[in-house]
Amino acid sequence: MNSTPANSTPLPPLQPFTPGSSAATPAPIALTRSKPRRRLSSNVVGVSDRRRLLQMLQNVEEVSPGPDSASEAGESPSIRSQDEAHLEHLSSARICMDEDKELLIHQALPAFENTLLRFVQALSKYDFRQDLAETLMETESQFCEAVDELVEHQQAAQTIAALERVSEGLDDKIRDMIRKLAECRRELRNYQPNNENQSTLSSADLLTYATRIANFTTAPPYFRERPEHSKLPWPIEDEMRKGLLALMEVGKDKTELGELADPEKFAHTAANGVAPNGAAPVANGVAQNHNNGYAMERRLSTGYGSDNDGDTNMNGRSGLAGLDIFDDDDDDDDDD
């Protein structure tokens, strides 16, 4: 089997195989053959559960934004979609852990290395074995699947890291919201009114009672305080009410107003009992409206509508009781 034809050129002497020597030239051939097969296996849909897991993880990455994009946008997607994606990813990761306790790369890589080493050693001895070539192709396909699984595992790890960052951000927001809610609750508790000191009477009852007694009650005498500057260049409201203009507004008779303006003119009358200028009749030379003029004069001096008007009309002398010229003992002397 090792005999060579006569017309063939002599071959160089064989060199012992070492991992770093140039004799391992067939290795790149196997790697170049694995590339199209790897692309073919990645394009096939539904080959195994790992392919579906990879597709699902890619969909999760497209749906869930990263922390940078969420911070730039100012708000994150709906909490429901993030929770669903997070639960879906956790369930898929749990399935992978249950099915494969250990990654295939841990078994495929040593098997591929041993098969490749045996194949290279056989080629170095000019002993080409068909079974080693087929075994190398099988181990190479298994190694490609293991590499694909390793890529999926790395992508899943990146997705888990991104979801953990999103979860930490949401946890921070939830803590801030809980802290703010606690502060608001504390403030609202402090702002609650004290029901013990609160009056049980309603405003409607108070208004109804005030309307009922409004026609029978008045304000206190000194309800309105005297203004601070009472001596102003113009008269105050109370003085204007006591004047003649206020009496005219009330509707007094012009004759009575004339008597108030000049009471002496109507106090002295003629002897024949006829009052001049159309005045009221007289008796015994004394005008009858003398007391009325005195009452109006008292009203002007004490104030219009005062409480002393009734007493003055009933007893004309009671208005002069406070004067020095009136002596109560004169009546007693006359009786004696």
UniProtKB/Swiss-Prot annotation:
Pfam families listed in its UniProt record: Med4
Compositionally skewed regions (Acidic residues) per UniProt: 325-336
Key word Coiled coil present: yes
Coiled coil: 154-192
GO cellular component: core mediator complex; mediator complex
Major localisation: nucleus
Alphabetically ordered keywords of this record: Activator, Coiled coil, Nucleus, Transcription, Transcription regulation
Record's keyword annotation contains Coiled coil: yes
Segments for region (Disordered): 1-45, 59-85, 281-336
Single GO MF annotation: transcription coregulator activity
GO biological process: regulation of transcription by RNA polymerase II
Source domain of life: Eukaryota
Localization, UniProt: Nucleus
InterPro entries: Mediator_Med4
Similarity-based family: Belongs to the Mediator complex subunit 4 family.
Described function: Component of the Mediator complex, a coactivator involved in the regulated transcription of nearly all RNA polymerase II-dependent genes. Mediator functions as a bridge to convey information from gene-specific regulatory proteins to the basal RNA polymerase II transcription machinery. Mediator is recruited to promoters by direct interactions with regulatory proteins and serves as a scaffold for the assembly of a functional preinitiation complex with RNA polymerase II and the general transcription factors.
Subunit-level organization: Component of the Mediator complex.
Listed name of the protein: Mediator of RNA polymerase II transcription subunit 4
